[in-house]
Amino acid sequence: MTAEAELLLMNASRAQLVREIIHPALAAGELLLCDRFYDSTTAYQGHGRQLNLAQVQTVIDFAVGSTWPDLTLLMLVPLPISDARRRSRNEQTPVRDRMEEADRSFSERVERGYQAIAAAEPV
C-alpha cells in the first residue's frame, strides 16, 4: 500500500468516526476520550511516511471538519521500551500491521513528528 493510500484510508475511517460516534456523543453532552486522533495522522503519515505536511493537513481538515479536541495529551515512551513491547506482542501473535513492520527510522520520524506537534501547540 502506498503512503498516500494509507493517508486516505486512515482519514476515511476518521471521517466515519467523527460523524457516527463523536458528533452524536458531543451533541448528547458526553465526555469523549480518544486514544488517537488527527495528530496521529500528522505524526505517522506526515512525518513517518514523509508525506507533504500541507497536503496531510488538507486531508485531515476534510475528514474531521471543525471537530477538534479541546486537549491533546502526549505520552512518549522511549523507543527502546516501545521496541521491546512491540517484539513481545509480535511473539504472542503472528499478525503484524504496517506500523509494526516499519523500520526503526520510521519510528524515530514519528516520534520527532509528535514532538514537533507538541512544540507547535503547547498547552
Question: Language model features by range: what are they?
Answer:
Residues 42-113:
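A glycine- and Lys/Arg-enriched "phosphate-lid" helix/loop adjacent to the NTP-binding pocket
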